[in-house]
């Protein structure tokens, strides 16, 4: 089974060195939450596989100097139009693999910035989605985020009019809303599981498999204005 934990935000200028600090904090915390997703001995730092736009993958250590150099390289690439990003993966025990891609530091008025973590695991495995979303949201200070999967996204598209091509905002089994979005959320939609940095709120919406509850929460949050897309052209990081 593959799950996604992802966050999005609008323009926020940051240097590759500043982004490296966020990446380091995230990558150093992931082994405690997903120990099965690497072959590294317990307690040892992971070495990640870095995927490039062209050419073979390379190894990347999650220390700040190497991360800053990799982000600077991407920032300076002729193929990069805004910000700097990385695409990393790690494989571990049988059936476990994670990939994480992200781009930040940009000032585009039309393309949101994002971090997307994908976790492939055995069907019966427990994945700490709430802890993962809380970690990523706390580090990256996004506008919104969610824990979801392809089936949920397809259902929202078919039954509730969700369309990612129109920059629609969605929520899955878990949702993260920045402060202004959280203030618009109607009472009774999910449980405020945790308040994070910047007054953002992590919402526990439904257990795995309860698609009806997710569709209902999505519609209620959307109709209340809590899932309003950032205006285009974007002039701020969060709603």
Residue ranges and their predicted role:
Residues 1-46, 150-239:
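C-terminal interaction module
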Residues 33, 37-152:
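Internal, hydrophobic cores of structured domains that mediate oligomerization or house catalytic pockets
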